[in-house]
């Protein structure tokens, strides 16, 4: 039986998605952590869940992060 809460099929792989997200967002705060985590999440599952829709969602979060960084003079 598929455990949709703890281990949904679209997040199964050799590495748990949550572990990847924790590692990738370590040291990031606020919107940078959110955008990074969401982009990775959608890229991680795209083939197993919503296909192109998930790729477009990942792209949206990446673009939003770039806009945030471009508007933040503290990021070099």
Residue ranges and their predicted role:
Residues 1-76:
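Intrinsically disordered, low-complexity regulatory regions
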């Amino acid at each position: 039986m598929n455990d949709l809460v703890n281990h949904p099929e679209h997040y199964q792989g050799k590495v748990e998605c949550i572990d990847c997200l924790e590692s990738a967002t370590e040291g990031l705060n606020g919107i940078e952590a959110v955008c990074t985590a969401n982009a990775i999440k959608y890229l991680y599952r795209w083939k197993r869940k919503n296909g192109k829709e998930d790729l477009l969602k990942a792209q949206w979060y990446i673009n939003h992060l770039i806009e945030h960084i471009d508007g933040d003079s503290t990021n070099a």
